[in-house]
Amino acid sequence: MSDSGFRPIAEGYDDRQDGCLFCVVRSNEFLDENAFCYASKDAHPVTHQHALIIPKRHVVDYFDLTELEVAAIHQMLIAMRNRIKNDDLTVNGFNIGVNVGKIAGQSIPHVHVHLIPRRQGDVENPQGGVRGVIPDKQKY
């Protein structure tokens, strides 16, 4: 199999978007990293240890990520989940989410996946989970 399909990925890591918060993060601010992404604390956490998984290449839309980047992000989600659960035994669930486009709540035009630790009693009734982005549709 040729690696030519991955050449733009490697070349893209040298290109950063001026003014992009996620393109200028210093590696000493990383919680963890792999070849294609890094984990960072959320600046405005929903819960304690809320993390962001961010591709190193500047990509605005999640659906424009390569399969390699998606796989690397998934591996990082697992690594961070394990780290959080080992650090905090009160964590017994997670929400994972991506906002794609301003209309969906994307506030920074660089892909980032939220990993939000959940604890018993952190909300009165968690039924519906991420469906709560449309409050009238959360309960079913």
Model-derived regions: residue spans:
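HIT superfamily nucleotide-processing domains
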Residues: 1-140
